[in-house]
Swiss-Prot record:
Name the record gives this protein: Arginine--tRNA ligase
GO biological process, one term: arginyl-tRNA aminoacylation
Upper classification of the organism: Bacteria, Bacillati, Bacillota, Clostridia, Eubacteriales
Coiled-coil annotated spans: none
Main location as per UniProt: cytoplasm
């Protein structure tokens, strides 16, 4: 797809390198190598449309003041056949490029021709990428950490798809290990209590105390009566887990679907034990000399591969640890299913996980750089200016379902992606339901609805958005028009950086800026009633803004209402 900003950066790169070659040839600069030219969009309007710090980078090598180097480079530039209007040296040695408006008109042409494909990139080149996220314990409802991880992971996956990767969304079901054992004990206790009274058995202090455990057992008793009351405890727990666990998983699936998160694969941890992959993984580690025994347990020699400490992979009771299954799971991802890259999203309590898992990959000759681990921080909910811990509906800890009922899917997904994953997030529940410009998601959706309304009104009077090549766009030169076009031009670059940094929070900030620029344009520039060519040019600008806002909201999986 066409990326006008990328074209301009290539032009600047070519102009600067040719200028340096010319300056070297005529003896103004000594011979030196330019490895990579860093080109950015300045934050200050007066600093031009694009800027580079090449003069400051080269100053030490060429033994001249950065400002002098900048002036020599500028003096030797040939700007013909480029979008560049003029170039200035600024500050300690920045080189600032000011462009003609022609590039902005070309941006509108690209948007009008590519429509929903605007911003699509090919940096992924079809590489197979797995994004594994949420992966909550299937022992209860989804909490706020799962909610943030869900919005973040799904948007990362969408950004990567937009950037040209072949993405698989995966949920790892933790259906083996301690939490399932505890789940079975909790179910058994509630089952017996419901049939024989609360005093019949003590509920485990570290068990799952949620109402859903009681609900499951009431439903089981209604269907099956006391058929398990007098069977062996192990068999009873197994049967109750087999009854309740699929219901919990289905509930999680429905909650996530209501949230706009749909997984391609639901992968069972237990399947790694059932098909022998955990055993095979442990055997290979032993054969390679990466295990040792100590205190009756089997340890992984992670320290031999760069970790700070070794890790237990089989407890002294002979049961593999969660980490052992996780190593097997990552072997499955890379060696059996052959993903080129894997991205795991984990809560802040998994901070030490990245280093040890990368060491485990090294043990199997898998490039550890193929694994990215995104750690996201905690969420605090606020209501009436105070931390909200309980659901207004249930009186229990706020679940994802409670949040969706209170603020809706759009607000939840937008708010969870307003901060970088590594930052703590304060979620204002009152703000999320406000129908005013204070509410960021409302502000963006209103800009989209306004653009649709403007075009709908004009169409009702016989004016349709024309073919972009039939209109003279050079009439678009009001400051608000220029700023809006510049902002629209940045979208492909925002996708590129978001894909490289795995930070979709860039997109919420970006679309807020687009909405702000559009509202400024709306207040300053009339469309209906203007001279015909200007009216049609502005219609193209309105429609291009509509397309970009819709495009971003689609990536964020947030609805774009045509009326509000």
């Amino acid at each position: 797809m066409t990326n006008v900003v990328e074209t301009i950066k290539k032009q600047i790169n070519e102009v600067v390198k040719n200028s340096i070659s010319k300056a070297v040839q005529n003896g103004e600069l000594p011979q030196f190598t330019v490895d990579e030219l860093f080109i950015e969009i300045p934050k200050e309007k007066g600093h031009g449309d694009f800027s580079t710090n090449i003069a400051m980078q080269a100053a030490k090598t060429v033994r001249k003041a950065p400002r002098q180097v900048a002036e020599i480079i500028i003096k030797n530039m040939d700007l013909s056949n480029t979008y560049i209007d003029r170039v200035e040296a600024a500050g300690p040695g920045f080189i600032n490029f000011f462009l003609t408006n022609a590039w902005l008109y070309d941006v509108l042409k690209v948007i009008q021709k590519e429509k929903e494909n605007y911003g699509n990139l090919d940096i992924g080149r079809g590489q197979k990428v797995m994004v594994e996220f949420v992966s909550a314990n299937p022992t209860g409802p989804l909490h706020m950490g799962n909610a943030r991880g869900g919005a973040l992971g799904d948007c990362i996956a969408s950004v990567l798809e937009k950037a040209g990767y072949d993405v698989t969304r995966e949920f790892y079901i933790n259906d083996a290990g301690n939490q399932i054992e505890k789940f079975g004990i909790s179910l058994e206790a509630r089952y017996i209590q419901l049939l024989k009274g609360e005093d019949a058995v003590e509920f485990p202090e570290d068990g799952y105390h949620g109402e859903d455990i009681i609900d499951h057992m009431k439903a089981y008793i209604e269907e099956n009566g006391d058929n398990l009351l007098y069977v062996d405890s192990e068999e009873r727990r197994k049967t109750l887990v087999e009854y309740a666990l699929p219901k919990n998983i289905e509930r999680i699936r429905k909650s996530l679907e209501n949230y706009g998160v749909v997984f391609d694969v639901w992968f069972s941890e237990q399947s790694l034990y059932d098909n022998g992959e955990v055993r095979e993984t442990l055997d290979i580690l032993k054969e390679k000399g990466y295990t040792f025994e100590k205190d009756g347990a089997v340890w992984f020699k992670a320290s031999a591969l760069g970790a700070e400490k070794d890790e237990v992979i089989v407890r002294n009771n002979g049961i593999p640890t969660y980490f052992a299954a996780d190593i097997a799971y990552h072997r499955n991802k890379f060696l059996k299913r052959k993903f080129d890259r894997v991205i795991n999203l984990l809560g802040a309590d998994h901070h030490g996980h990245a280093a040890r898992m990368k060491c485990a990959l090294k043990a199997f000759d898998i490039d550890p750089d193929k694994l990215d681990i995104v750690i996201f921080q905690l969420v605090r909910l606020y209501r009436n200016g105070e931390i909200a811990r309980m659901s207004k509906r249930t009186g229990r800890a706020i679940s994802l379902d409670d949040l969706l009922e209170e603020v809706g899917r759009d607000a939840a997904r937008f708010f969870f992606n307003t901060k970088a994953s590594g930052s703590h997030l304060d979620f204002d529940l009152d703000l999320a339901v406000k129908k005013s410009n204070e509410n960021p998601v409302y502000y963006v959706q209103y800009a989209y609805a306004r653009s649709c309304s403007m075009l709908r009104l004009l169409e009702s009077e016989g004016f349709k958005v024309p073919d972009v090549d039939s209109v003279d766009l050079t009439v678009l030169k009001a400051p608000e028009e220029i700023e809006l076009m510049k902002k629209l031009s940045e979208y492909p670059e925002e996708i590129r950086i978001s894909a490289q940094t795995l930070e979709p929070s860039r997109l919420t900030r970006y679309v807020l800026d687009v909405a702000s620029n559009f509202h400024s344009f709306y207040n300053a520039c009339r469309v209906k009633g203007e001279e015909e060519n200007l009216m049609y040019a502005r219609m193209i600008l309105v429609d291009s803004t509509r397309l970009v806002i819709k495009n971003v909201l689609d990536v964020l999986s947030i609805t774009a209402p045509e009326k509000m």
